[in-house]
Design a protein with these regions (language model features):
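Ordered alpha/beta subdomains of enzyme catalytic regions
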Residues: 1-111
Length: 111
């Protein structure tokens, strides 16, 4: 019997707001600078192997891809971001209509 629990991003509540706030502020800056259509890169990584470890194994790539592909800012997300008074209305409108269309480059799962 398989007792392993998995996390299915597609069937969970909206996880969009787990995004890094810095990424949102930078994206708003790109838009305000007229670079809305410029290709940019954001990374998901760590700088140092934890606990003085000597290696790391890539795991969870499928869930990362599902998360990115399902990113959708709902009305509550937009209202919250608006309440912070950090983002332009143009950017909030952009987020409300956002759909990921980029590419994801990653190490092979399990390596």
């Amino acid at each position: 019997m398989n007792n392993i629990k998995t996390f299915d991003v597609k069937n969970q509540r909206n996880l969009t707001m787990l995004v890094d706030f810095y990424e949102l502020t930078m994206s708003n800056g790109y838009l305000l600078d007229g670079a809305k259509d410029r290709i940019v890169y954001f990374d998901m990584f760590f700088r140092k192997v934890p606990e003085k470890g000597g290696y790391a194994i890539m795991a969870g790539l499928e869930q990362v891809i599902e998360y990115v592909e399902s990113l959708k800012f709902d009305k509550g997300d937009i209202d919250y971001l608006r309440s912070l008074d950090c983002f332009s209305e143009e950017f909030l409108e952009y987020l409300a209509n956002f759909k990921f269309t980029g590419s994801i480059y990653a190490m092979k799962e399990g390596t």
